[in-house]
């Protein structure tokens, strides 16, 4: 059937790359001509279970598949031609799989092997050298898995690490669960990214980390001294929740991004690298910072922090600031160049809200009680275009004329009747709240709904270890990630997590905010 549309086939295929998988199917099902384009349309939003798609006429066009011997025969004889992500679980014979599908393996980039007998993968005749990223689980000997093309290695559970990795060309290693061994074995000199996992709590030793390391993540439990252990040249450094050691003469001057854990409470005066541009502290930190962070652009402090961060003698370059309740003082000075301000407050009448700099366009208010908008000087908010609220609000936002994007947390309890800004364009709202109050929303407002959990059950299994504390603080961290994405700010993120971002709206508005697994893994 010829193309009856006033648009070239190639352009149609190109535009469909920006649709989610469900929308792709709906779109090409509208006419016979579009169905004929199926051979050029691929589905890669998520990892699909093989037995759930094998019966489909377009099963050849899935790029991410999950094979599980418990639900299909271990004698697999089908792999899609252009598959990029292959996940294999339990009694599937990977040797047979590769031998029978040798001509289809050239496109595989990500291989995930879980609880199977791997054999000598690197000795296979039809070993797919296109593989760049490898995931392994259980007590597997990684020597049998490493092949020359692999540069990223993700290790789950208790994989066998009693080996020398120095021969490989790995640039990234991530341990997820269970790793707590000495780092006496040799990491490859090519390694740039290392995540030691949340259970790692074994002392680092001098020269145990490769000299070319740029990104280091020490997990939840790590709490040993680090002096003389970190290589010069390190750029990004993240400590876990339990870390409380001294950092004097321990952090290289090359570090530009530093995140401290929730229990870190020690003084940092004179100990922070002068090149820092991104700095985060947890809830336990409450030590002076004035004059210590001249180049920091992104600063997050915890609920205990109450010291000034700038004054006339110590100007600040901070453009993104997250602060807690203790800074609610009449004489507290906020940086003049702020663009994003996230406030975690515990007062009905927060003084700090009357001192918002004119430079702020992105404002997040997290409050455990309520806020009375009637007491606000609206002239202070003419510059705000993005506003986020998570609490009960008295009054109306109608006179916040420049707010075009509004995010309401799942615990937001105010009626939307005569509440929303007059010029609102985008509204992010929990799905059930939307159903109850949609009659109060103008038809020209683009709705983005999300489920009350913000994340799916599968995602929460991976994400739960990154957020601690009460739901209020969960919300703060999640919304921070969204606004980092909005501001296009360069920031540290955990390897399996992307920012919360708005996704495409579908016909029933049930699309929302989500936290997808990165396709880069």
From Swiss-Prot:
| FNIP repeat feature ranges | 179-221, 222-263
Enumerate the InterPro entries for this protein.
Answer: FNIP (IPR008615), STK_FNIP-Repeat (IPR051251)
Q: Could you confirm whether the keyword Repeat appears in this record? A: yes
Q: Which UniProt keywords apply?
A: Repeat
Name by which UniProt lists this protein: Putative FNIP repeat-containing protein L162
Q: Which organism is it from?
A: Acanthamoeba polyphaga mimivirus
Source organism superkingdom: Viruses
State the taxonomy lineage: Viruses, Varidnaviria, Bamfordvirae, Nucleocytoviricota, Megaviricetes
Ranges in a coiled coil = none
């Amino acid at each position: 059937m010829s193309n009856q549309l006033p648009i070239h086939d190639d352009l149609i295929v190109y535009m469909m790359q920006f649709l989610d998988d469900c929308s792709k199917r709906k779109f090409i099902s509208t006419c016979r001509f579009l169905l004929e384009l199926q051979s050029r349309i691929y589905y890669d939003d998520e990892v699909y279970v093989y037995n759930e798609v094998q019966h489909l006429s377009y099963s050849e066009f899935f790029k991410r598949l999950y094979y599980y011997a418990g639900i299909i025969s271990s004698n697999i004889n089908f792999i899609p031609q252009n598959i990029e992500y292959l996940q294999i679980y339990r009694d599937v014979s990977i040797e047979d799989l590769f031998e029978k599908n040798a001509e289809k393996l050239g496109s595989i980039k990500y291989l995930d092997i879980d609880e199977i007998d791997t054999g000598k993968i690197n000795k296979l005749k039809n070993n797919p050298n296109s593989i760049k990223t490898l995931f392994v689980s259980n007590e597997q000997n990684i020597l049998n898995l490493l092949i020359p093309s692999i540069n990223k290695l993700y290790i789950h559970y208790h994989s066998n690490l009693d080996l020398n990795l120095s021969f490989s060309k790995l640039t990234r290693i991530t341990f997820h669960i269970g790793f707590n061994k000495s780092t006496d074995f040799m990491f490859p000199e090519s390694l740039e990214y290392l995540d030691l996992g949340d259970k790692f709590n074994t002392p680092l030793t001098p020269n145990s980390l490769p000299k070319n390391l740029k990104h280091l993540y020490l997990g939840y439990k790590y709490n040993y001294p680090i002096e003389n252990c970190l290589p010069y040249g390190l750029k990004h450094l993240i400590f876990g929740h339990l870390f409380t050691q001294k950092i004097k003469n321990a952090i290289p001057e090359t570090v530009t991004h530093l995140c401290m854990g929730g229990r870190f409470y020690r003084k940092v005066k004179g100990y922070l690298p002068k090149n820092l541009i991104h700095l985060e502290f947890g809830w336990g930190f409450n030590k002076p910072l004035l004059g210590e962070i001249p180049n920091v652009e992104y600063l997050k402090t915890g609920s205990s922090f109450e010291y000034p961060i700038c004054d006339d003698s110590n100007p600040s370059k901070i453009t993104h600031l997250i602060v807690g309740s203790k800074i609610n003082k009449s004489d507290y000075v906020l940086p003049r160049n702020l663009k994003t301000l996230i406030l975690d407050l515990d007062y009905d009448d927060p003084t700090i809200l009357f001192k918002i700099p004119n430079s702020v366009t992105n404002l997040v208010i997290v409050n455990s009680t309520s806020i009375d908008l009637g007491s606000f000087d609206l002239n202070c908010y003419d510059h705000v275009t993005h506003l986020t609220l998570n609490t009960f609000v008295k009054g109306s936002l109608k006179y916040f004329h420049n707010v075009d994007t509004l995010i309401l947390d799942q615990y937001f309890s105010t009626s939307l009747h005569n509440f929303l800004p007059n010029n609102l364009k985008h509204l992010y709202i929990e799905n059930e709240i939307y159903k109850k109050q949609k009659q109060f929303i103008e038809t020209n407002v683009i709705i983005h709904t999300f489920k009350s959990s913000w994340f799916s059950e599968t995602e929460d299994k991976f994400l739960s270890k990154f957020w601690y504390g009460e739901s209020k603080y969960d919300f703060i961290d999640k919304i921070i990630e969204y606004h980092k994405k909005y501001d296009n700010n360069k920031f540290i993120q955990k390897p399996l997590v992307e920012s919360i971002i708005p996704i495409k709206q579908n016909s029933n508005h049930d699309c929302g905010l989500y936290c997808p697994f990165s396709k880069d893994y």
